[in-house]
UniProtKB/Swiss-Prot annotation:
PROSITE patterns: RIBOSOMAL_L24 (PS01108). GO terms for biological process: translation. This is Large ribosomal subunit protein uL24. The lineage of its organism: Bacteria, Bacillati, Cyanobacteriota, Cyanophyceae, Synechococcales. GO terms for molecular function: rRNA binding; structural constituent of ribosome.
Length: 118
């Protein structure tokens, strides 16, 4: 899948403003309204994996003799447009903007409140 995306002529990687470890809220889909921490970002597909959200069950057959099969639950990816950064202090969602501070360091902040993230 990733190789086929890279081979396309006009393929461009989408910049993601959400990073691993951010707290996000789902704004669209069956899990709408739930919040969780981003475990993994997949920039080439513009997707994120959020802890405890969009769970899928996977049935695993026994591989060795004497072993029993299992049912695993794991998080599936969500499209990045379906999640939004969530601020615990202000209890609201907001878009993220980049800015350069006085020392010349690039940082992120919330557009609604101006709260600096990192």
């Amino acid at each position: 899948m990733l190789d086929s995306l890279k081979q396309k002529k006009n393929f461009q990687r989408i910049k993601m403003r959400i990073k691993t470890g951010d707290l996000v809220k789902v704004i669209n889909g069956k899990e709408k309204g739930k919040t969780g921490e981003v475990l993994k970002t997949i920039p080439l597909e513009n997707k994120v994996v959020v802890k405890g959200i969009n769970l899928r069950t996977k049935h695993v057959k026994p591989t060795q003799e004497g072993e029993t099969g299992r049912i695993l639950t794991e998080e599936a990816s969500l499209h990045a447009s379906n999640v939004m950064f969530f601020s615990k202090e202000k209890n609201l969602t907001s878009k993220i903007e980049y800015f350069i501070d006085k020392e010349g360091v690039k940082k992120r902040r919330l557009k609604k409140t101006g709260e600096v993230i990192d």
